[in-house]
Amino acid sequence: MTYDECFKYLHTIPELCSSPVIDVRYNTDEEQQFFYHGNRICYMLNYKIIFYKWGYVSNCDRYFLVSWTSIIYDQLTKDQIDTSIKVYKKSEIEHIKYEKIQKAQKLITDIKQDFV
C-alpha cells in the first residue's frame, strides 16, 4: 500500500474525518494532512492503531513542534507495541515520515502473514 493509497483509505472511514480545523502553517497540503489529524482510529484485524497529533509551526518557521503519540496494541491482550512523544526540527520531518510509513507497511505485512 502506497502512502497515497493509505490516505485514500483512511479518508473513507467516517471516524477519521472529523478533525477540527486549526490555523497552522505547513509547507504543503500533504504535510498538513499527515501531521494534523486530531484523533484518528484505524482498525486492522485484531490490531488498533491510534494516532494523536497536535502541531505548531513557529513564526520564524524554523522549528516544528510536534507531540505525536502512536499507540499500537492487540485488542485482545491490550499489549502495547509502540508509543512515542517527540519534538522535531523541521529538517527531520521527511525522514520521520518515511520511517513511520515503513513501520506501518511492515506492521501490515506482518499481520497479513499471520493470517495466511
Name each model-derived stretch.
Residues 1-7, 90-92, 99:
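Short helix/turn-capping signatures at newly exposed starts of structured segments
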Residues 21-95:
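Acidic, low-complexity, intrinsically disordered interaction modules
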